[in-house]
């Protein structure tokens, strides 16, 4: 289907493999050519540049019940400054993780999951975590 003037297509990294690096393009090695569509005006209304959006699949149950394993996540790769309680995609020790982040004293970060019974809070030095971007959207088929 042709794109309307208000539509944009963003990369959908369905199968990803992380490598060591400092930014999303360095962290993600596999791009399969898939794309998802978003409304440009909706993204702009929320302060998101369409060129900064990528989508990935959630892996695991640590963020249930908010989003389950396999949910599709929209990430704003330009939004890397931690706002306490927001959800971010991060490269932590070579693992792509989707977690709630909270700033702590002494350059530490608390890493939280919604499924906190199975995944207790963690702490890490800020320099151990590469923030890929803030999760601004997700889609789930129930």
Show where each model-derived region lies.
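Amphipathic alpha-helical interface segments
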Residues: 113-142
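Short, positionally conserved secondary-structure boundary motifs
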Residues: 1-69, 132, 137-142
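Short, hydrophobic/aromatic-rich segments at coil-to-beta transitions
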Residues: 50-55, 83-88, 110
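Short, compositionally biased
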Residues: 85-97, 103-107
